[in-house]
């Protein structure tokens, strides 16, 4: 049984996956993070495990170009000594100035992963609280619905908007996703900078990884 204590361990980067053939063998449950470029995926992963330098953060949109795998330290990965869970930082989408060929490569990798990974238990789709769900986000949500991959919306950077605006934004977001078949009907609000909402997200991840 996976518990939130897992987030207090040291975590390590184990591999970057530029193409499907480089994926690790299917084993422990995987929890993936998707979102627009610079939505704060890497910062949120670092905050979740309280390790500032684990996932590389960058002011340059499109920095994450691979599926980056992170697991708790202390497991050999051999035989039965597998980590109980893996976190996967996915390439950001919606970065318009990247070369089209590169964007197409990222897109194919992400879509193939979402459709074909049996051990993927949930995707957390990160939405910048300042902007809400945009057209490109809707495209990704539609893909997840079509692939029947369970996903949950996580609002990021809530410290950048007025406190009173957060409940309203949560309700607006719920209304936008209520008819989507694969959407988990609960929206989480987080701030990596302030440490807000992290315990709730950790609990949600554990529940999803345990099959809930």
UniProtKB/Swiss-Prot annotation:
Necessary for normal cell division and for the maintenance of normal septation. Keywords: Cell cycle, Cell division, GTP-binding, Magnesium, Metal-binding, Nucleotide-binding, Septation. Belongs to the TRAFAC class TrmE-Era-EngA-EngB-Septin-like GTPase superfamily. EngB GTPase family. It comes from the Bacteria. One of its GO terms (molecular function) is GTP binding. The gene is engB. Pfam families: MMR_HSR1. GO terms for biological process: division septum assembly. GTP binds at residues 35-42, 62-66, 89-92, 156-159, 190-192. Its cofactor is Mg(2+). InterPro entries: G_ENGB_dom (IPR030393), GTP-bd (IPR006073), GTP-bd_ribosome_bio_YsxC (IPR019987), P-loop_NTPase (IPR027417). One of its GO terms (cellular component) is cytosol. Mg(2+) binds at residues 42, 64. This is Probable GTP-binding protein EngB. Residues 27-211 form the EngB-type G domain.
